[in-house]
């Protein structure tokens, strides 16, 4: 993963954690744990998926689906 890709991924993690805090009433630590321990995170760090280049809203929908159903759609 190059520096630009890492920056985009880190930005997504931050934004998704903030969204999860708001929607699920989580602390920052719990929200980050949710994101970092998700199947979504495995996929976003795989540059071949291109998820790092998608919008935070799109990625958050994937994370919410995983929380609700146990897997990324």
Cite the ranges covered by each PLM segment.
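C-terminal alpha-helical interaction appendages
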Residues: 1-73
């Amino acid at each position: 993963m190059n520096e630009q890709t890492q920056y985009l991924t880190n930005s997504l993690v931050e934004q998704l954690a903030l969204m999860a805090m708001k929607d699920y009433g989580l602390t920052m630590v719990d929200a980050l744990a949710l994101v970092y321990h998700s199947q979504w995170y495995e996929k976003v760090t795989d540059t071949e998926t291109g998820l790092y280049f998608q919008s935070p809203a799109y990625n958050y929908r994937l994370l919410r689906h995983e929380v609700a159903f146990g897997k990324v759609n």
